Amino acid sequence: MLIDIAVNITDKLLAKDESSVEEVIRRCKDSKVLPIFTGLDHQTSKICINLAKKYKTVSTAGIHPTSSSRYSNIDEIVPLVNDETVVAIGECGLDYDRLEFADKVSQKRIFRSQLDLGGSCYFFHSRSCHRDFMEIVSDYRIRGVVHSFTGSIEEARELIKKGLFIGINGCSVKTLEGIEIVRSLPLESLLIETDSPYCKIRRSYAGFEYVTTDFSQQKALKKKNEPCCVVQMAEVVSNATGKDYDLVVETILDNTIGLYGDVLKKSVERWGL
């Protein structure tokens, strides 16, 4: 089985209504994939928690950096991060590519506030901000994953040295440099994701040549990304590095459960995958 650590289940492009969510979950189970739902703010975190309870999976809860300007504090989030289905605080961090949504000051303030909660695990967003990101997290003893990684090999190694995992998806293997980064990093430092409905491994991406499972014949998956497609990321890691596929799956599964702990482990058992 596989675990997709980043599923934007509240995004209408992924599932526009309740029946669409049911279909996404059905395809997950058919593909033996457990989805972790991603909270982006107070409202989406609440929805993710409720859906996680309904479908016996888990979620994150937090404030995405681009939502930072809408919050003067994080009081609304605190009860949510303590919910029994929440495995990590996040999505939180910094995003300097989209400062039109929230300035650097707001992002840093809300980021630090979430780190001050002292969570057991964090689901991080870091985009074009590595130096500031590292400066902030260096003040904390944390465990977590930097998801949708598109930085340099030097940045990845610095994050790993801090004790963080690297989350990779289609955007991570868009270029030949991205493939080389995947080859260079220890398998024990990787988690995989779709960030669905985004970050699909497109035909124009360098990573596409390492994909063996074709979802294009399924109408629902022709254009969008879904958590069931995370199998393609496992294939890219295996085929690009020359490592045995079963070893890749087993190692990344161990990494994921090791990071998220008993709450995720129990969810895996409930799904019976």
Swiss-Prot record:
Biological source species: Encephalitozoon cuniculi (strain GB-M1)
Q: tRNA processing as a keyword?
A: no
The entry's protein name is Putative deoxyribonuclease TATDN1 homolog
Described purpose of this protein according to its UniProt entry = Putative deoxyribonuclease.
Q: Where does a divalent metal cation 2 bind?
A: E91, H125, H147
- Which EC number(s) does UniProt give? 3.1.21.-
Coiled-coil residue windows: none
Main localization of the protein described in the UniProt heading:
nucleus
- Where, subcellularly, is it found? Nucleus
In the record, what lineage is assigned to the organism producing the protein?
A: Eukaryota, Fungi, Fungi incertae sedis, Microsporidia, Unikaryonidae
Kindly list the GO CC terms recorded for this protein.
Answer: cytosol; nucleus
Family membership noted in the UniProt record: Belongs to the metallo-dependent hydrolases superfamily. TatD-type hydrolase family.
Keyword Hydrolase assigned: yes
Residues holding a divalent metal cation 1: E91, D195
Q: Which UniProt keywords are present, listed alphabetically?
A: Hydrolase, Metal-binding, Nuclease, Nucleus
Cofactors named for this entry: a divalent metal cation
* Molecular function, one GO term: 3'-5'-DNA exonuclease activity
How is the cofactor bound, as the UniProt entry phrases it?
Answer: Binds 2 divalent metal cations per subunit.
